[in-house]
């Protein structure tokens, strides 16, 4: 089905969060090294509470988060300190990180703020030990080369990494993060994805951003006419952005259709809670049979709508379940999907009878501890009443495939307040003017094709590679571009597909090997086995010795003479055409220890001698 996004009034904007590849964190001198949870050296526990803003208001998103009283566990390392623990004041803002953000702002033709003030953004989901995230506005009002507007660029501290629901790792907390916010100027799913790709290209062009899964996240703001602004958090895959937008448009259209149907039916929400625990004492449903309390409500004339699909894999009932889960319950049951899950038809009949439900009504039940059931039912009633409004303003999280689930209400202005522990930073015109704009990756691709003779796809791979700088350094050191590309790109890709841990190989080790190859000390044919050895943790010297043990010219001559003698009849029969096959046998035996040109020269002389004596 073709969707007319212009007719629907689609408006979208995007926020991109990218980790910066700095030596130190934003407000302490700890390294920005990602660790494994098993390497943790200690732990501590916290409960988090929301604080009121300067105006005495409590942020609605934080208020909802406080519904769940949770104890958070934090893992510490020998690369984290008391700043991450929120037991020591923050150090001054990282100047290296600020220069990177200012450079990106300059690329986007933005105006830097004259003085940077750090703010506190209230976050009590456990991802910050302090209960807030530090963020600073750096620049405003810019444009991308494609025309999309950039509203703001901020410098933030990264959140802690969630290991489990209430367990967080502090290795990531405090890594400098750039937040780029576009204006709501996009009107098709494809435009959103293209804009994200363009921003990603600019970020990578700096050579100062981290790479890998989790280092970049896209938040998408979407609304349609008569709908509402919804923020979708944490889209990590660029290729999924357009699909996420399409599915959110589908969801909002479906919710608006449900709104109109509810009005047409004269539907209503019955707020009386009914205890139906006794109806399921002998149920085949393990969840219901073992539950200490089962409560039910009747949604008048909601039949068929709670179970209606609003986007792939999601129904209106899924939305209600998301709200209920905020109270700690596992979910809900509703009569649009029953009998099922061990609930029999007789139990459904008795349930409807207990609530005086007609065939036009939908009954929802929740099973858990009494207090949780009460809380969950109030949330379900709240979400059911929102259905009469259409689309609620929400922050949502992306699910696999591109559909989304409710996270929390959209935060308000009460979420932000000044950070009193961090000094302001002046941004002088001289400082901003001194920053050099990096070469954009599109221009790098064109240059690699023209200067180095690389094919377009190879040039693109090399330009986007995190080893790009080392590749250029190798060429400036006298290494031929084709060999440098093999070493820093194509061979590493092949080895990675074979399972080699190529991320362990240091750029300087590859460069050292290339210098040895260029000097003739190591044959270029040995490049792949040498890189394999480097991936296993060998030093360049050890890797070369293992993969390409030195063979003297005298030893090589003996090897060639022996192989030629063994194949004398074949050589006499084929003449000079035998050179290729015999060359392959020799190269296999010397295993790249000798340059192919030298082997070819000695072999041709040996074959010539055999043919001369024939």
From Swiss-Prot:
Origin superkingdom: Archaea
Cysteines paired by S-S bonds: none
Reactions catalysed, as given in the entry: L-glutamyl-tRNA(Gln) + L-glutamine + ATP + H2O = L-glutaminyl-tRNA(Gln) + L-glutamate + ADP + phosphate + H(+)
A molecular function GO annotation: ATP binding
One BP term from GO: translation
Family to which this protein belongs: Belongs to the GatB/GatE family. GatE subfamily.
Name of protein: Glutamyl-tRNA(Gln) amidotransferase subunit E
Species name: Methanospirillum hungatei JF-1 (strain ATCC 27890 / DSM 864 / NBRC 100397 / JF-1)
Lineage, highest ranks first: Archaea, Methanobacteriati, Methanobacteriota, Stenosarchaea group, Methanomicrobia
